[in-house]
Amino acid sequence: DVLLDAAAFAPTNRLDLSQWQPDFVDLSFYKMFGYPTGIGCLLARKRAVQRLRRPWYAGGTITFSSVVAEGHYLTPGAAGFEDGTVNYLGLPAVELGLKHIESIGIETIHTRVQCLTGWLIDQLVALRHSNGRPVVQLYGPVNTYRRGGTVQVNFFDPDGRMIDCLDMERLANEARISLRAGCHCNPGAREVALGFTRDDLAACFRDQESRTFEQFLQKIDGKTTGALRASVGLASTFADVYAYVQFASTFIDRPAHVV
């Protein structure tokens, strides 16, 4: 069975399921129009759902269960996989959001996001310190070919020292710019991009059953563990990306220890 993760793709692109024919497709309505949080969906072929078997069950997913007889019957179809009470107060917002996207047109959204993202990338990679060194390092393509609206970077001072992404997130928030810092649910990509080795990280999982994030940072000698992410989407405007570039330009010739 094939699962297509379209959560990041679908909000700004038309997904052609006649060309790609997976068994399952997951979507996030929050990523599409920003509200409501915590609601997504799994599109599934009927024959694929019939092959699924659950090792446990929760409320709302069974037709009958017995403790004495130690048995249960799973609700047929998709309902057998919807644990608990669905968010019936938030679901009407999904219908309104989909109608809003339909009224604009996904192609229009795609073109707009592509233009804003392309301009943002061009401006960020062009930033230079007086000595010619780049202010930011961009992860991923330097153009919009095969790229969505997510722009991930790290900032560097004139001496090439990386400025911690958590500090950058804090400063951006103070400037009323919403950025996210971290590994963004993709630790493997983070480790490759930042050059962490197996030996660097294996020590973090020795000797202790658990470790706080602060203890983790101490174990890797305070190295930056992520990057700074800006997401361009349906609600983004040119004023948004322009404000980010203006903010980024304030780090030209700015030493890391001053941040």
Enumerate the predicted regions with their spans:
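Pyridoxal 5′-phosphate
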Residues: 1-259
